[in-house]
């Protein structure tokens, strides 16, 4: 039986999903990031899932799909989904409030279909470019809001002691200004780490392993997580935002036609493999700020340039404190349990769809094996 549900300017929450996460839903909250009035971009992200359970598998099929978080720089304005599932609903009932479309099928035999259309509006988030910090000074006494404090804590993949703390101290030295400390960490990550296209997906972001091994290579989750862990170890709240590219980079494409996202002349892009992780850090007395050291390394490799190259340095400067929003973020979840709970336990992150057949996961890193396809179309 075909089922269709449509949500506009809001999302439908399950009864369980109305319960906020205990760690983050406190009475004192950080101010939302501010975005100067700029032209907004509009995209439709169309997702097609035809789940492909492994041969011989049987049993209940469950699918968790990450949906965009609403912020000052991006909003999910509409959501529609249809398919032959038995149940499907949206929930945020997890520690990070990660917005999730959950669907189930009673058995893995036969077609397992769901189509999802997401309307998204974005605005470039450029606080440093817009000189938003020109009057900022670090408070004499730094007190973080309760919903920011969790982003100082370690997780399984982002520890803040041992080699991480040792490295952070070497990078920041005697610097006390939190913005300058964040910049030192960002510069270290973008200049010392290298992109490795052989890494599966976006990388695992296992910071302790990366630093202990001395092999400072990986992909976007690896770079972003190293930045996050080093920042937290330095007393600066930081977090990853897992998401996906949506199309052409209007501003940064002058430096690379391929590194930052692309689309055809009609604004259509196949983004099935376009997952990308970015990072944010928090300044007391101001709020959250964006950065993206991983895309510096991606551009450097794509264009076969050194870090000292003028174009690389221009990108490096822009991506500390600014994001071009031909991309959308899903959630900040790291080392956490989805809802409903998976058989496999805590997720490293939730930047990809996740599915289980009778408790066994399907390879979400391979769109063809899973299988899913994503097409983003910019509305002009």
Regions from the language model: what does each represent?
Residues 30-126:
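Intrinsically disordered, low-complexity N-terminal segments that are enriched in acidic
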Residues 248-252, 256-380:
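Active-site rim recognition segments
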Residues 104-159, 340-380:
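Secretory-pathway-linked proteins and extracytosolic
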Residues 93, 115-195, 201-214:
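Acidic low-complexity segments
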């Amino acid at each position: 039986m075909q089922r269709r549900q449509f949500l506009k300017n809001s999302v439908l929450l399950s009864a369980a999903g109305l319960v906020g996460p205990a760690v983050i839903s406190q009475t004192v909250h950080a101010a939302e990031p501010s975005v100067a009035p700029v032209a907004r971009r509009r995209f439709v992200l169309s997702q097609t899932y035809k789940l492909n359970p492994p041969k011989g598998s049987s049993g209940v099929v469950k699918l968790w799909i990450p949906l965009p978080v609403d912020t000052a720089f991006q909003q999910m304005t509409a959501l529609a989904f249809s398919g032959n599932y038995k149940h499907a609903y949206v929930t945020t009932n997890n520690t990070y409030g990660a917005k999730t479309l959950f669907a189930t099928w009673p058995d893995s035999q036969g077609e397992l279909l769901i189509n999802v259309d997401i309307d998204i509006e974005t605005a470039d988030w450029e606080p440093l470019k817009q000189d938003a910090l020109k009057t900022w000074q670090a408070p004499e006494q730094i007190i973080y809001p309760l919903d920011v404090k969790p982003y100082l804590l370690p997780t399984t993949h982002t520890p803040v002691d041992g080699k991480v703390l040792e490295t952070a101290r070497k990078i920041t030295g005697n610097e006390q200004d939190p913005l300058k400390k964040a910049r030192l960490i960002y510069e270290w990550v973008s200049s010392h780490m290298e992109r490795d296209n052989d890494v599966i997906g976006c990388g695992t972001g296992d910071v302790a392993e990366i630093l202990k091994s001395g092999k400072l290579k990986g992909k976007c989750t690896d770079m972003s997580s190293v930045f996050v862990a080093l920042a937290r170890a330095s007393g600066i709240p930081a977090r990853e935002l897992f998401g996906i590219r949506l199309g052409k980079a209007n501003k940064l494409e002058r430096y690379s036609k391929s590194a930052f996202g692309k689309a055809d002349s009609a604004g259509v892009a196949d983004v099935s493999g376009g997952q990308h992780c970015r990072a944010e850090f928090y300044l007391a007395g101001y709020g959250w700020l964006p950065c993206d050291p991983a895309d510096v390394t991606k551009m450097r490799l794509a264009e076969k340039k050194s870090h000292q190259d003028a174009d690389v340095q221009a990108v490096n400067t822009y991506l500390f404190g600014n994001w071009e929003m031909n991309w959308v973020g899903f959630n900040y979840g790291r080392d956490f349990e989805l809802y409903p709970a998976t058989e496999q336990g805590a997720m490293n992150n939730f930047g990809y769809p996740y599915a289980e057949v009778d408790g066994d996961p399907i390879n979400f890193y391979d769109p063809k094996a899973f299988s899913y396809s994503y097409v983003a179309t910019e509305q002009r």
